[in-house]
């Protein structure tokens, strides 16, 4: 058996990264693609490896010969690489393909070590490795039947999103018998080039053979890691996928989202309602996708109107943000004097302030719990102008009930302290909507109070980036509206607010379902040895590790062995040295049980 690697392409989409080298000379985590591939091939009993070079071919040949002198490597040059595609590169190897069975690979692949053995050990004579379609995949797709026959090759121009559930992506790894190449593939390859030219793809020939039903090529599905690197984003994703466990965890944590790029990842780090929006609302959003994509959104005036309708408060009291983060930044920059903060907290607020302007309260217990009376007692003799309260708190889940909140906000009003209440998680609390301060009479009676709410978290739409701040302080609201851009909300977010009223009952039911699941999950977690669960009124649990395992080591085990991402809190401000805390989101029953089982296996 021989291997053929196609490595003539220019890799234009990679820009500066391929300015003076071909794609397979790119490094992923310090290892060149071609080095990784040749190392993997060296473990297989191959008579020779044929590499088709083209763009910057001399550099590639010199590098390979200096590093892999123990391999029998044959180079084939494609001198017209700049005006041909891989169909011509493969055609240049036709005589070799007649002589031996071939393992055919593209050079821009990064593959798990197990993948090539899948092709070598497949029971069928001719195989194409395929993977179930995911959104990152581009290029040739196939459809297969129940017996793994490839019934069609689908080129990019024939791709139909409505057929995505049936698609598999070709991994661009094939094992082809020499008789198949000699009697079927190469004659069609020659005819195809003569009729359609050299700037095509070799998969098109397989498609033609399949359509006339003379092919004997089977699909072998894989679920191991692999990636095809065509642009700089692909390069970054590949670096994350194939990083060491430690580096992979760090890269995922520093991405701050975008985890759809990593199929199968269970995200217990970010905090989103698992039960809303439901299918009917999503279908309405989909049905209006094209006009929302093509039309400009409204300005701040209309969006304030929609947000007021959304929460049942007056338009003039509301400013809408591109996520609560935009409003947090604007508000923190607006406030004068010192700010009271309860630690540990959601650090987006204090990170927007000078440390010297912060007056910090640290609850003196392992649950980080506190009451309204605790806050009034601590801050009553402190020289603060504003007090921040996240209720329920993040990350502790501590909750001050509504009656006590009223005492606290009135105390703040009487002592000339502006109280900033972030109630992004209040809908998850027992009592739900009855605990909100987003009420006209309260805002008017307590005009210095500011209420912040992230729509992303409670309502399960973080991709829309929506948040609101409400206050009856008309001068503050006017300054904040002036500070944010007129078109700070996109059309999809605006339309979501526009139609939400039709789905309010669904949202209420979703919150009820969530509270039931929180109770179930809490009961499960309490069964895990070495894990102390802090009571929570939010959509997450803060947990202390009471055994020998550190939070970092647990996070590492979960991402490595279970593809589960959690929040390691040990580096957050406000946690005592030596204590090990994690925060885990509460998802649906299936996902929560998967995490519970992982905990049981690791922490036993």
Tell where the protein language model's regions lie, with residue ranges.
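Conserved beta-loop-beta/alpha segment of the NTase-like Rossmann-fold superfamily
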Residues: 68-140
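N-terminal "arm"/small-domain region of PLP-dependent enzymes with the aminotransferase-like
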Residues: 237-295, 382-383
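PLP-dependent enzyme catalytic core of the Aspartate aminotransferase-like
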Residues: 277, 403, 560-561, 566, ...
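Conserved PLP-binding catalytic core of the aspartate aminotransferase-like
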Residues: 515, 528-562
């Amino acid at each position: 058996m021989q291997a053929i690697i196609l490595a003539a392409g220019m890799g234009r989409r990679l820009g500066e990264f391929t300015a003076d080298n071909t794609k397979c000379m790119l490094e992923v985590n310090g290892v060149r693609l071609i080095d990784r591939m040749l190392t993997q091939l060296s473990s297989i009993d191959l008579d020779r490896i044929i590499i088709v070079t083209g763009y910057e071919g001399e550099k590639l040949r010199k590098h390979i010969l200096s590093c892999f002198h123990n391999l029998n490597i044959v180079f084939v040059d494609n001198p017209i690489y700049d005006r041909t595609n891989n169909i011509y590169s493969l055609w240049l190897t036709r005589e070799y393909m007649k002589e031996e069975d071939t393992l055919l690979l593209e050079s821009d692949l990064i593959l798990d070590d197990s993948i090539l053995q899948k092709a070598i050990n497949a029971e069928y004579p001719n195989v194409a490795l395929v993977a179930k379609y995911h959104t990152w995949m581009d290029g040739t797709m196939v459809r297969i039947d129940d017996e793994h026959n490839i019934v069609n090759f689908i080129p990019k121009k024939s791709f139909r999103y409505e057929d995505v559930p049936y698609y598999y992506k070709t991994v661009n790894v094939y094992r082809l018998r020499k008789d198949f190449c000699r009697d079927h593939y190469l004659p069609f390859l020659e005819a195809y080039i003569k009729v359609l030219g050299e700037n095509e793809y070799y998969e098109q020939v397989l498609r033609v053979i399949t359509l006339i039903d003379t092919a004997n090529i089977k699909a072998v599905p894989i679920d191991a890691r692999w990636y095809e690197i065509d642009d700089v984003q692909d390069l970054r994703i590949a670096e994350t996928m194939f990083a060491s466990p430690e580096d992979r965890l760090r890269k995922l944590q520093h991405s701050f989202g975008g985890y759809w790029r990593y199929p199968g990842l269970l995200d217990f780090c970010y905090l989103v309602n698992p039960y809303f929006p439901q299918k009917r609302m999503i279908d309405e959003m989909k049905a209006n996708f094209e006009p929302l994509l093509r039309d400009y959104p409204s300005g701040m005036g209309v969006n304030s109107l929609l947000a007021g309708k959304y929460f049942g408060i007056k338009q003039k009291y509301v400013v809408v943000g591109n996520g609560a983060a935009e409003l947090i930044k604007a508000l923190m920059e607006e406030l004068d004097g010192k700010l009271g903060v309860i630690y540990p907290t959601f650090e987006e607020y204090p990170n927007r302030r000078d440390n010297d302007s912060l007056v910090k309260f640290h609850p003196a217990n392992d649950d980080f719990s506190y009451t309204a009376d605790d806050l009034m007692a601590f801050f009553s003799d402190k020289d603060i102008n504003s007090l921040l309260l996240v209720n329920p708190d993040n990350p502790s889940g501590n909750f001050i009930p509504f009656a006590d909140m009223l005492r606290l906000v009135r105390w703040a009003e009487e002592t000339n302290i502006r109280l900033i209440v972030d109630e992004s998680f209040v809908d998850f609390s027992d009592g739900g909507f009855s605990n909100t301060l987003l009420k006209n009479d309260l805002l008017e009676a307590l005009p210095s109070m500011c209420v912040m709410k992230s729509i992303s978290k409670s309502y399960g739409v973080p991709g829309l980036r929506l948040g609101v701040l409400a206050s009856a302080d008309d001068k503050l609201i006017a300054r904040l509206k002036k500070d944010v851009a007129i078109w700070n909300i996109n059309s999809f977010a605006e339309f979501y607010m526009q139609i939400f009223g039709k789905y309010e009952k669904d949202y209420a039911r979703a919150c009820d379902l969530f509270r039931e699941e929180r109770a179930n999950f809490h009961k499960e977690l309490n069964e895990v040895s070495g894990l102390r669960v802090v009571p929570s009124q939010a959509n997450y649990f803060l947990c202390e590790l009471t055994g020998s395992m550190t939070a970092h080591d647990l996070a590492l085990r979960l991402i490595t062995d279970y593809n589960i991402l959690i929040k390691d809190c040990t580096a957050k401000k406000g946690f005592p040295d030596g204590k090990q805390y994690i925060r885990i989101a509460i998802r649906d029953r299936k996902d929560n049980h998967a995490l519970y089982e992982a905990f049981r296996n690791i922490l036993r």
